[in-house]
Every structure is written in C-alpha cells, then in structure tokens.
Amino acid sequence: MNEESPRALSRELVLLLCVLALMVMLALTALFSRLYHKKVHTLADAMFAQGEADERAAQQLAGQAQAAHFKLALTDYRNALAYNPTNPLFQFHLARALAAAGRDDEARSYLLNLLSESPGSGEINLELARIAARNNTMADAMRYYQGAIYSEWASDPIAMRWQVRRELCETLLNRGQVKQAAPEVIALAQNTPADDAVRLTIVAQLLLRTQQWNRALEAYRTLLAGDPNAEDCLAGAGQAAFELGQYVTAMQFFDRLPRERREQPDLLNLFDMTRRILVADPFLSGLSAEVRAQRAANALALVQTRVENCARQTGQSLEQTPPRTDLQRVYQQSRELQQDWTPRYLERFPDRLDAAMAYVFSVENAAAAACGEPQSDDRALWLLGRSRSVVNR
C-alpha cells in the first residue's frame, strides 16, 4: 500500500501539469492570434487610409496625374481587402475608385453585391445611378437615383436627399430630357426653404431650364426680396417675365441691372427684344390716342413688307385669285382694309385699333408658318401677338 501511493500521486501531478501546460499554450495561441489579427487590421486600415488619400488627391487633379492617383488608390484598396476581404466599407471605396477610373463593369459588380446586403444604402444607390447615367441606361439611372433619394444616409439625410435630387435634375437636363426633369425640379423646389438663398438660387435656375416660368419668377421675387441688387436674380427674373409675355415687368428687372451686365451675351438679345416690343406695343397704358394710332400704322406698314418678302421667298403669287394659302389670304385682306387703317383714321376711331393689330398678328403668324420665325422688329410684333393671345385666351 505504501509503495503504490507515490505512484498514484505522481500520475495526478503529471495530469495536472499537462492540463496547466495545455491552458498556457491555449492562452498563448489566443494572444498571438489576437496580436496577429490586430496587426492585420492595422495594416488593412493603413492601406485603406492611404487609398482614401490617393483618391482625394486624384479628385483634385486631371489627365494623366489623376489617372495615376486613381491607380494608386485602386492598389491600396485591393491591398486593404486582401487583409480584410469582407469589409463592406473597403469594398464600397474600391467600387467607387473603379468607377472613377472608368471601369464601370467591375464597379457595378461590387456595388450590386453590396446592395443585395444593404438595399437601403443611399451611397450605394447613388453610385449605381451615376454608372447607369454614364452608360445612358436612364431607366436604371432613374431607379437608382430614386432609391438614393428615399434611402438611408449616415449623416444629414435631408441635405443628402436634396443634393441627390438636384444631381438627378442636372443629369436629365444635360441630356435634354426637360419633360422628365420638370417634376423632379418641382419636388426639389418644394423641399427648399424660402430663407435658404443658396439653394433657392439653384432651384430658380433649374426652373428656368425646365421652362417653368411662373415658378421661376416667383422664386426670383423671393430672392430679390432679400437682396434687391442680386444681378443673377434680376437677370433670371427678367428672363422669366419675358417668356411669360410680361414685357413691362421684364424691362423693370433689366433696367435695375448695370449696363455692362445687360450687354453680356446671355441678356443682350433679350433686353434688345424687350425694348423693341415695348416701342412697338400700342396697348401700353399711358399712351395718347395719337401715339397708339401711329404705332399701329407702323406695324401695318412693317407686316406689309414682311408678307411681300415671304411671298418672294416661297414663290407665292399674292395676286392669286381666289387665294389658296394663309399668306395670300392675309394679303387680300390688307388690300380691302388698308384705306381704313391710316394713322388719322385709327386716331379718330380708336376702337378699330384692336382689329388692325389682330390683322398684324395674323400676318406675322402666317409668315412665320411659311418662312420661319421672324427677326428684328417683325419678331417683336410676332412675340407681342403671342403674348396677347395667351392673355386673351
């Protein structure tokens, strides 16, 4: 009994030592594993940070220098993913860099995988929208843009959704898709505070580009209430009023601009045409009967020349009996009524001025249909007629 007891104790001791040794080895393994993974993640984060720096540098450059930095960013992001292959942030930045480098197919593949895992990501939807727009697949672009607008954003979601919708508007307008852009611009305007002058200015410009003249004029009036001398707002308001046929209002805005601004290419023709229209318009308030009659007589003389020139241009005989074309019909009408539309007659019978000017407008319309839109003073009369038809409708 006494001889076997030490042997039993030594077996227990050996077992205990083995267990302790195993625990120490497991602890060391866990420690080294943590140190390894920490080192790997540190390397991955360093590679990712370098990729971000290269990407930011590329965005500030152009040409070959930009391409070189995007190439460096791609290498950095790929290296980061080699150390941390499941990191979605690394994958997203790699996809964005691929897209910036023109490698849309590769970028789309990464982004679609990410979208399947995070369908509510605004950033992923936006990048997919941009790729689709670049490749002229506008149905997909619209879908992804809408997804980005109504998706989640990590910070300041209201501002990001506004920016995305603005980008959608610009994308459509740059492709000439004015009708498709119009409702998006309206939605953008509805989400723009009236006291945010910077954003409201952008909206007003987009309203002009989508030919929503009333909304544009309203937006510019709001802006001018805060800054009455803002030149771009005065110019935009003048253009909107001009397109609405509100020529007196347009001139009021143009007159508030410095002469140098009115003479710039974007306004010179508008200002000149507004002036011509107001000089020719016999319906302006405050004019004497004599001036109204003289303006109407001048318009009648002008359209007489217009109809004759247009007939020569199109090879029509104005003596055709019976008249067959609109141009021939308005010419025959002038021969019948010309003697009743002298300045003295129109001054004596001012109620006949409406009929005389209606004839002027019918001549300009007939000539425009036969020979194209008029220029100079004829264009002034043509536009005046169009604006009055809208008012009287």
What are these regions (language model features)?
Residues 90, 124, 157-158, 164, ...:
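TPR alpha-solenoid repeat register
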Residues 93, 127, 160-163, 167, ...:
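Canonical tetratricopeptide repeat
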Residues 2-83, 88-89, 386-392:
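N-terminal leader/linker segments that initiate helical-solenoid repeat arrays
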Residues 103-106, 136-143, 170-180, 211-215, ...:
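Alpha-helical linker/edge segments of TPR/alpha-solenoid repeat scaffolds
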Residues 41, 85, 119, 153, ...:
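Short coil turns that delineate tetratricopeptide repeat
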